[in-house]
Amino acid sequence: MRQRILRLSIVLISVLSALALFGCGSASAPDGTSFVLNRDGSVTQTIIGTNDDMIGRNDLSAFIEQQVEAYASGRDEPSVELNSCSIEGNRISIELQYASIDDYADFNHVPAYDGDVEEALTKGFLFGSRFLTDSGLEYSGYTIPVEYPEMRVLVLQEPMTVSIPEKAVLYSDNMKKNDDGS
């Protein structure tokens, strides 16, 4: 049964932040910061925050555009794009589009990875956590690299809602799945 479950899915989610939230639905109207891994490998990030400094939308948008332009300099194609920036009261909402997860990681200066387990290990990511299935089965993270080196894995370290294009069969025990099971 265990091998069948794991063979049916190539997706393993390992979010290393103890506060991370997980979802497989749409992130079009998030309540907090969200990360959407799209089918084409691009990433959509929505950042929700508070405007304690009472910065204006134009100033905030100009600052983000400046960061995007600085990141784009020296690159052949644009890889980060500001989709939207809004301020309502003291609530800030920013949506950024990244060409790839590598652009997301580089732009935000955070570790992030999408690929197979074997390559994740060569990049220094470890799988020491416990992993759970929807049915409540537990797996040691230490057995995953040995038994399933070609399994797909998504590694993030930030507390946020995560949405993926496929159903996750395993997820780390420091995550919370949405009430609807996603």
Feature locations, PLM:
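Bacterial N-terminal signal peptides that target proteins for export
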Residues: 1-12
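Solvent-exposed residues in well-ordered beta-strands and their adjoining turns
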Residues: 38, 50-52, 97-101
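Short amphipathic beta-strand and strand-loop transition segments with alternating hydrophobic
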Residues: 33-34, 79-87
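Bacterial signal peptide processing site
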Residues: 25-27
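C-terminal motif of bacterial Sec signal peptides marking the signal peptidase cleavage site
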Residues: 20-23
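Mature, soluble, non-transmembrane domains
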Residues: 85-182
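Post-signal-peptide N-terminal segment of Sec-exported extracytoplasmic proteins
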Residues: 45-73
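Long, amphipathic alpha-helical "stalk/connector" segments that mediate intersubunit docking
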Residues: 30-48
